[in-house]
């Protein structure tokens, strides 16, 4: 029996305003989860993440298992004790990272064998091992082990991949056993709507605490992503959280909320920040462009983050050009605050019954 509780507070069309409750704290949805692959969101402290409004962060099973390893983390207690984040943590199962290894992996019914990207040693990962690692980490939300269907894939390739993921989903559920943490199933099936239907049906029969859409934002055209979202999101169980994995841009988030999604994660705001690619209320600003060299204006006058309250575009441009670590930090603080504020504004619009109006205005005004 999971300790997670989900409350659907309000709906507008397909868009949902909700709350996911855990002993470690509540997650107001729609929610964006900053990505802390190795247990830390790059350059930021837990205090800073809380100040910007994050209710939950994402850690990566694959990377934490390889380094530092669960034995070291268990000496502290859980991942929360190790990294100082006392709110909920979701851990990805490692399936996507194995997928990204490409030809360096060997896939069988039992699991995946691959060379460690750290020291080249032979490593084996299976649904059972992934569930044990996530139990050891003390994850609040555990993701079942799956194979992320590559793009492009023929219908047969997508079907074979999806069916393997469904068998692994059942093994994940069995191995999860009496773990009170929430376990989410992952819908696969590539760009084929009927395969997505088959996958969702299988996952409903296994019965999970939440449902995720996987295998999107892997190189497919935007219209295909929207088509699969349109087809799939509203069919997911109404009484459980819906999570879109690895997506995406501010526009993607607004459009996915419109289609009924509750949870998101993406490396984009933090990774792009380190490359001087800033998200603002008016669209994307590329701070390393020469035109910002003598621009004394604030990055985003509509933003309340530390960066926007204290530093000019000119200074941020200077930090980027000189590759100062502070530049990465200030940029990351801004981008993640922007994403958290976007979700807060979406939640408020849903509470006030004006999300459709908010969406229309956002899509008209946001450039990039």
From Swiss-Prot:
One of its GO terms (biological process) is queuosine biosynthetic process. InterPro entries: ArchSynthase1/Queuine_TRR, TGT, TGT-like_sf, tRNA_ribo_trans-like. Residues 246-252 are annotated as: RNA binding. Its cofactor is Zn(2+). The active site is at residues 92, 265. Its EC number is 2.4.2.29. It is an enzyme of class 2 (transferase). It catalyses: 7-aminomethyl-7-carbaguanine + guanosine(34) in tRNA = 7-aminomethyl-7-carbaguanosine(34) in tRNA + guanine. The keyword Ribonucleoprotein does not apply. It comes from the Bacteria. Pathway: tRNA modification; tRNA-queuosine biosynthesis. Keywords: Glycosyltransferase, Metal-binding, Queuosine biosynthesis, Transferase, tRNA processing, Zinc. Substrate binds at residues 92-96, 146, 188, 215. Catalyzes the base-exchange of a guanine (G) residue with the queuine precursor 7-aminomethyl-7-deazaguanine (PreQ1) at position 34 (anticodon wobble position) in tRNAs with GU(N) anticodons (tRNA-Asp, -Asn, -His and -Tyr). Catalysis occurs through a double-displacement mechanism. The nucleophile active site attacks the C1' of nucleotide 34 to detach the guanine base from the RNA, forming a covalent enzyme-RNA intermediate. The proton acceptor active site deprotonates the incoming PreQ1, allowing a nucleophilic attack on the C1' of the ribose to form the product. Homodimer. Within each dimer, one monomer is responsible for RNA recognition and catalysis, while the other monomer binds to the replacement base PreQ1. Belongs to the queuine tRNA-ribosyltransferase family. This is Queuine tRNA-ribosyltransferase. The gene is tgt.
């Amino acid at each position: 029996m999971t300790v997670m509780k989900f409350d659907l507070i309000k709906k507008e069309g397909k868009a949902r305003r909700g709350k996911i409750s855990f002993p470690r704290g509540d997650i107001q949805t729609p929610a964006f989860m900053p990505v802390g692959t190795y247990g830390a969101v790059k350059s930021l402290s837990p205090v800073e993440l809380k100040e910007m409004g994050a209710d939950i962060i994402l850690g990566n099973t694959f990377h934490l298992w390889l380094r530092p390893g669960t034995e070291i983390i268990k000496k502290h207690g859980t991942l929360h004790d190790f990294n100082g984040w006392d709110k909920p943590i979701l851990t990805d199962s490692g399936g996507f990272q194995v997928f990204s290894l490409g030809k360096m992996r060997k896939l069988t019914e039992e699991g995946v064998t691959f060379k460690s990207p750290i020291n080249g040693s032979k490593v084996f990962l299976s649904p059972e091992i992934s569930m044990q690692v996530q139990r050891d980490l003390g994850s609040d939300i555990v993701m079942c082990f799956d194979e992320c269907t590559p793009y492009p894939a023929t219908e047969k390739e997508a079907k074979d991949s999806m069916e393997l993921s469904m068998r692994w989903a059942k093994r994940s559920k069995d191995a999860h056993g009496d773990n009170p943490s929430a376990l989410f199933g992952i819908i696969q099936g590539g760009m084929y709507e009927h395969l997505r239907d088959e996958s969702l049906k299988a996952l409903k029969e296994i019965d999970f605490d939440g449902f995720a859409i996987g295998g999107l934002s892997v190189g497919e055209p935007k219209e295909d992503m929207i088509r699969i979202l349109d087809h799939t999101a509203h069919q997911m169980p109404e009484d459980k959280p819906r999570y879109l994995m690895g997506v995406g841009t501010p526009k993607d988030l607004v459009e996915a909320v419109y289609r009924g999604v509750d949870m998101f994660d993406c490396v984009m705001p933090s990774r792009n920040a380190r490359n001087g690619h800033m998200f603002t209320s008016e669209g994307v600003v590329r701070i390393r462009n020469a035109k910002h060299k003598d621009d004394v204006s604030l990055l985003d006058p509509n933003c309340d983050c530390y960066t926007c309250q204290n530093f000019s575009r000119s200074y941020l441009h200077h930090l980027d050009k000189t590759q100062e670590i502070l530049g990465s930090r200030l940029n990351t603080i801004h981008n993640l605050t922007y994403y958290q504020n976007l979700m807060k504004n979406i939640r408020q619009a849903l509470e006030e019954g004006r999300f459709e109006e908010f969406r229309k205005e956002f899509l008209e005004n946001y450039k990039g």
